[in-house]
Curated annotation (Swiss-Prot):
The keyword tRNA processing applies. GO terms for molecular function: RNA binding; tRNA pseudouridine(38-40) synthase activity. Belongs to the tRNA pseudouridine synthase TruA family. One of its GO terms (biological process) is tRNA pseudouridine synthesis. This is tRNA pseudouridine synthase A. Substrate binds at Y111. Formation of pseudouridine at positions 38, 39 and 40 in the anticodon stem and loop of transfer RNAs. The gene is truA. Its EC number is 5.4.99.12.
Length: 243
């Protein structure tokens, strides 16, 4: 029997989604409690592995298990009871067709990146937003962001550890909204390269600060060293996954 689950979590304090030998991970916490509740070894398969410090509001994973006396809503309640101190919350579980795959059935992934643009440091939103103290040119950010939308070779916008066979991706959306001192980047695509969203944000901030050339020039270079810094993980949220 295959289950589809939606989970939210605060990435601070975790080594990321993926299970690690010597550091806590979201995957390990979920597999441990699900295995305990369902009385069998559970392995979860995720839509997209988030890095250390990255958060999720709508991460999706699937797992297989024998038929259980527990109903899906009971599994949700039990998991949340056991993980109440971990800042991991299971939002929903449902039984799905066995052809469903959290990663390969996905047609679009949506991310948000949050910046707090003010001079004073953060307290409440520390580790939930990137604090940028310098004044940013919002119009320039929005203008340059649109040059990233569409199908491009994003070689300049992936980390050196990226394992993808090529850097060609289609970015469906990259929009920026501002509400007071908060700036939110909305990015959507079927798939992203490793650190792509964070490098795009870091590059746009560098351009808006007058430190870098234009996005079109950076794309044409096809070299990571021409793009801006990788924005810190604390501002990135996996918002939802479409199927």
């Amino acid at each position: 029997m295959r289950y589809k689950a939606i989970v939210e979590y605060v990435g601070t304090g975790f080594s990321g989604w993926q299970k690690q030998m010597s550091a806590p991970s979201v995957q390990e916490e979920l597999e441990s409690v699900l295995s305990f509740l369902l009385k069998e070894k559970i392995a979860v398969n995720v839509a997209g592995r988030t890095d250390a410090g990255v958060h999720a509001l709508g991460q999706v994973f699937h797992f297989d298990a024998r038929e259980s006396t527990l109903q899906p809503f009971q599994i949700v309640n039990a998991v949340n009871y056991h993980l109440k101190e971990k800042l991991i919350v299971l939002l929903k579980i449902e039984i799905v067709d066995e052809t469903f795959d959290a990663r390969f059935s996905a047609i679009r992934r949506h991310y948000q990146y949050k910046i707090t643009n003010r001079k004073t440091p953060l307290a409440v939103f520390k580790n939930r937003s990137w604090h940028v103290p310098q004044t940013l040119n919002l119009d320039l950010i929005r203008e340059q962001a649109q040059y990233l939308v569409g199908k491009h070779d994003f070689q300049s916008f992936r980390s050196s550890k990226c394992g993808a066979s090529n850097a060609i991706r289609t970015l469906d959306r990259l929009e920026v909204e501002k509400n007071g001192e908060e700036m939110i980047f909305h990015a959507s695509a079927k798939s992203f390269l490793h650190h792509q969203v964070r490098i795009m944000v870091g590059t746009l901030v560098a351009i808006a600060s007058g430190k870098l050339m234009s996005v079109t020039e950076i794309l044409s270079k096809k070299n990571r060293r021409y793009a801006g810094p990788t924005a810190p993980p604390c501002g990135l949220y996996l918002l939802k996954v479409d199927y």
